[in-house]
């Protein structure tokens, strides 16, 4: 065939012919139309147009068609420096006047604006200062312990060593009846907090033992089993009992509480003891697993005491108590060895309040009991009231101002203590909050602000040192003489014990100082802390019984005391009518601004904790910043902004603030049903409440459960079909672009 007969074919090929077949093969299906189109364009090598950023300050960031006003607005948004923004937001945050701050900046609200109106204008339960007050829980003047049947050895020991000369009203009623009972009846002891219920059952038990002619030592067995709801109360009863029996060294008490080594407790039980004092869980554990404790109880046990019965039931120990009583009743009692002791077990139940739980426990533990009470009778019921010598105060504070009002209250107490010149005495103040995370936040907020402090006992006790600026009354020329404590159930038992001992001890370390303890209700029951001048309830109690126990930490044994209750505007104001029957002597209703904040922040200057200087201070270079005095509301705002700036700059402190706020809201939702009409989480303004924890906005992780280390844990989400399709498409595109794809 010649060349002329041949046929020539011309083919036009693109440069990416090889790759196009693969790209066409990767067909995108499923999902939305926009997603399919975007993925198809990406596979074809086309670029996807992106939206321009609206906050770009250059000319290329301006959206066409908006005109000159858009350019001016963009330049105006970016013209504020960070210092001017914070100054502007602090002055008038609720009115932006049309100006828009950058998206990454935080909104700082004003303390004194947009607060809920306080409707209570008149105090309906006024405290009359002209009425003569007789302390309701004070020792009686005309009575002696000897006339009640207490042995002379104990009477002299009480007067010389413990400095107790007169019995209280409940002790006068209880001691003779328990001594002369001979095992016929059980007893229900009901009295006010701070009236001496512990001695009302310990003194007759020890007196009965000392009146026996039989020789007694630690090997004679346990005569009494005392059960308390908390470790702190059990430890206090143990120390009181140890002090009482120090006059007769052959009587030995034993403490059984959680957090201690069981091996050491078993060793003490093997050596022998005459009084077993402990918490329900640990006592039941030893009754079930320690053989020697049953041997101790079978020889001499005659008394079972349940102290703070309402708290035992509130903490859910009803089944534990029933098991303990059942085991003890199954132990045979040998009454021939000590014939002068009661021939059967005597049960005693002690409580400062009468609740449904106490009534259930009374039906389980007591039989043929006698009621011993010094409460007032009303409509055939016994009503427990606060001590007559207690000065109760109530203040209604908006949620945003809770923290700065608390600081002003503590400042006023400290300032009055310094002005009194009583350097030889020790002043104690207890601040009750709702949860342990809130304790941690307030403890660090008031003790770790500027580094001028030192730890005294681990990390739970801090002494404020010279140069500290937490309270406006502090001066650079002298030591603050303020010690901050924290106490809650999440601390280790050793730290809880050492903290309480340091707070209650009168020595050179606490002499002339103001001791402030932030705590939960773990310190509200039964603890006899000496010379507590004031009790502050920053968070209202979960039940009115807890309120009586809280205020009972002060005004004990006839001494004067003060208590301050914080309430929020709105529904919580009606709580005053609810607690009015428990305060027959009335209360003082304080205005938070004029009577608390103004005395604390007036005639002082609170400096900022950053390097920013006001414009009026820049004009005078030689003038000291601290020489100029500002209005009290400006000082209060500056103080609170210092806390907020610390939250922003310190991640660890911010974590404490977030955890404290979230735990506080969760705890607020646990009020009993009868009080939900006053304390309902739906009534809270969460944004305003977050500001009282130094937060400039409500945390977004409110519903997430937090792990123990504070990090929120999220479960991995399952991949849906659309995301899986995109992932497979990306893998196909990557495979096509690979150099190994032939």
Curated annotation (Swiss-Prot):
Q: Ranges for the Helicase ATP-binding domain?
A: 178-372
Q: Does the keyword Nucleotide-binding apply?
A: yes
- Similarity section: Belongs to the DEAD box helicase family. DDX31/DBP7 subfamily.
Q: Where does the record place the Helicase C-terminal domain?
A: 405-605
Q: Which SUPFAM superfamilies match?
A: P-loop containing nucleoside triphosphate hydrolases (SSF52540)
What positions carry the motif DEAD box? 307-310
Which intervals of the chain are annotated as region Disordered? 45-100, 701-726
The main place the protein resides is nucleus
Q: Which GO terms describe its biological process?
A: rRNA processing
Q: Which GO terms describe its molecular function?
A: ATP binding; ATP hydrolysis activity; RNA binding; RNA helicase activity
The record lists the catalysed reaction(s) as: ATP + H2O = ADP + phosphate + H(+)
Locate the residues binding ATP: 191-198
Notes on the domains = The Q motif is unique to and characteristic of the DEAD box family of RNA helicases and controls ATP binding and hydrolysis.
**UniProt name for this protein:** ATP-dependent RNA helicase DBP7
Keywords of the record:
ATP-binding, Helicase, Hydrolase, Nucleotide-binding, Nucleus, Ribosome biogenesis, RNA-binding, rRNA processing
Q: Where does this protein reside within or beyond the cell?
A: Nucleus, Nucleolus
What ranges does the record list as Basic and acidic residues composition bias? 710-722
Q: Where is this motif: Q motif?
A: 143-172
- Explain the purpose of this protein: ATP-binding RNA helicase involved in the biogenesis of 60S ribosomal subunits and is required for the normal formation of 25S and 5.8S rRNAs.
Stored Pfam families: CTE_SPB4 (PF13959), DEAD (PF00270), Helicase_C (PF00271)
State the organism named in the record: Saccharomyces cerevisiae (strain YJM789)
- Enzyme Commission numbers on file: 3.6.4.13
The entry's cellular-component GO terms read: nucleolus
């Amino acid at each position: 065939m010649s060349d002329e007969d041949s046929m020539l074919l011309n083919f036009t090929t693109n440069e990416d012919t090889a790759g196009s077949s693969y790209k066409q093969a990767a067909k995108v299906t499923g999902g939305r139309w926009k997603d399919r189109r975007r993925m198809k364009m990406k596979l074809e090598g086309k670029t996807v147009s992106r939206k321009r950023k609206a906050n770009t300050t250059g000319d290329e960031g301006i959206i066409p068609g908006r005109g000159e006003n858009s350019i001016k607005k963009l330049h105006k948004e970016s013209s504020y420096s960070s210092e001017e923004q914070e100054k502007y937001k602090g002055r008038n945050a609720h009115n932006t006047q049309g100006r828009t701050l950058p998206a990454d900046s935080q909104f700082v609200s004003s303390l004194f604006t947009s607060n809920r109106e306080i409707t209570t204008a008149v105090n309906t339960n006024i405290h009359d200062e002209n009425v003569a007050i007789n302390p309701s829980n004070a020792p009686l003047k005309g009575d002696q312990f000897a006339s009640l049947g207490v042995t002379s050895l104990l009477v002299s020991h009480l007067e010389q060593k413990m400095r107790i000369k007169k019995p209280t009203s409940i002790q006068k009623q209880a001691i003779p009846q328990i001594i002369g009972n001979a095992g016929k009846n059980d007893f229900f002891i009901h009295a006010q907090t701070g009236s001496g219920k512990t001695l009302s059952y310990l003194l007759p038990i020890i007196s009965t033992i000392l009146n026996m002619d039989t020789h007694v030592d630690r090997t004679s067995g346990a005569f009494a089993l005392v059960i308390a709801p908390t470790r702190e109360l059990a430890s206090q009863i143990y120390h009181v009992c140890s002090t009482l029996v120090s006059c007769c060294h052959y009587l030995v008490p034993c403490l059984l509480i959680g957090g201690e080594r069981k091996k050491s407790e078993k060793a003490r039980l093997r050596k022998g003891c005459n009084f077993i004092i402990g918490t329900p869980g640990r006592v039941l554990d030893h009754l079930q697993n320690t053989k020697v404790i049953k041997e101790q109880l079978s020889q001499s046990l005659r008394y079972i005491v349940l102290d703070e019965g309402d708290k035992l039931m509130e903490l859910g120990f009803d089944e534990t108590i029933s098991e303990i009583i059942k085991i003890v009743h199954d132990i045979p009692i040998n009454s021939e060895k000590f014939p002068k002791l009661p021939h059967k077990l005597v049960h005693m139940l002690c409580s400062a309040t009468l609740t449904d739980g106490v009534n259930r426990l009374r039906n389980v533990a007591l039989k043929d009991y006698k009621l011993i009470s010094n409460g007032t009778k009303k409509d055939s019921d016994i009503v427990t009231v606060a001590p007559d010598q207690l000065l109760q105060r109530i203040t209604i504070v908006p949620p945003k101002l809770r923290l700065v009002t608390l600081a002003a209250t503590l400042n006023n107490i400290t300032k009055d203590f310094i002005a009194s010149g009583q350097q030889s005495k020790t002043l104690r103040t207890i601040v009750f909050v709702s949860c342990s995370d809130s304790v941690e936040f307030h403890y660090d907020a008031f003790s770790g602000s500027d580094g001028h402090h030192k730890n005294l006992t681990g990390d739970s006790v801090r002494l404020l040192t010279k140069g500290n600026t937490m309270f406006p009354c502090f001066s650079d020329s002298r030591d603050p003489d303020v010690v901050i404590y924290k106490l809650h159930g999440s601390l280790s038992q050793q730290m809880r014990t050492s903290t309480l001992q340091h707070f209650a001890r009168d020595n050179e370390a606490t002499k002339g100082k103001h001791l402030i303890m932030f705590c939960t209700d773990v310190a509200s029951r039964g603890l006899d802390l000496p010379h507590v001048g004031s009790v502050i309830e920053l968070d209202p109690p979960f039940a009115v019984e807890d309120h009586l126990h809280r205020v009972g930490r002060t005004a004990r044994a006839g001494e004067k005391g003060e208590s301050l209750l914080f309430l929020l505007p709105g529904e919580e104001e009606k709580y005053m009518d609810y607690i009015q029957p428990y305060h027959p002597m009335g209360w003082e209703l304080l205005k938070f601004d004029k009577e608390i904040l103004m005395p604390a922040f007036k005639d002082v200057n609170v400096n900022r904790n950053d390097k920013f200087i006001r414009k009026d201070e820049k004009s005078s270079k030689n003038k000291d910043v601290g020489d100029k005095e500002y209005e009290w509301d400006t000082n209060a705002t500056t103080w609170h902004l210092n806390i907020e700036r610390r939250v922003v700059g310190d991640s660890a402190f911010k974590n404490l603030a977030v955890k404290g706020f979230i735990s506080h809201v969760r705890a607020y939702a646990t009020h009993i049903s009868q009080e939900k009409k006053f304390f309902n989480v739906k009534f809270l303004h969460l944004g305003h409440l977050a500001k009282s924890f130094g937060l400039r906005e409500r945390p977004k992780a409110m519903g997430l459960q937090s792990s123990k280390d504070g990090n929120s844990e999220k479960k991995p989400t399952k991949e849906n079909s659309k995301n899986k399709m995109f992932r497979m498409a990306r893998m196909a595109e990557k495979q096509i672009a690979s150099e190994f794809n032939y």
